[in-house]
Amino acid sequence: MLVFVHAVLVTALILLLIGRIQLLERLLLSHLLNLTTVSNVLGVPDSSLRVNCLQLLKPDCLDFNILHKVLAETRLLVVVLRVIFLVLLGFSCYTLLGALF
């Protein structure tokens, strides 16, 4: 029965971790969209104050490949955690049914 309780606790922690990683994924997508928007705005020749302020914020090299790689890694991590979650959930159900019968 103690193994079942541990499996349930680990399953709950994995669910919380999946939620946090999905939040990280949304933040990465938002950051990628912001960089794309800044890059598009800075590509337009304009001498307005807004573009001048954005030029101060522009990094030397907008490397979108790094953000795409991190985004892919977070999605892969979510998939792996979901597989672990399903295995633990199956083990918990099997243990509970074994304890009942």
From Swiss-Prot:
The keyword Transmembrane helix is annotated on this UniProt entry: yes
Topological type in the membrane: Single-pass membrane protein
Compartment(s) where it occurs, according to its Swiss-Prot or TrEMBL record: Host membrane
Keyword presence, Signal: yes
Transmembrane regions listed in the UniProt entry: 76-96
Signal peptide: 1-43
Entry keywords, A to Z: Host membrane, Membrane, Signal, Transmembrane, Transmembrane helix
Domain of life the protein comes from: Viruses
InterPro entries: Corona_7
GO cellular component terms, A-Z: host cell membrane; membrane
Coiled coil segments of this chain: none
Pfam families cross-referenced by the UniProt entry: Corona_7
Record family assignment: Belongs to the coronaviruses ns7/ns7a protein family.
Function: May function in the formation of membrane-bound replication complexes or in the assembly of the virus.
Name used for this protein in its record: Non-structural protein 7a
Provenance organism: Feline coronavirus (strain FIPV WSU-79/1146) (FCoV)
Lineage per the UniProt record: Viruses, Riboviria, Orthornavirae, Pisuviricota, Pisoniviricetes
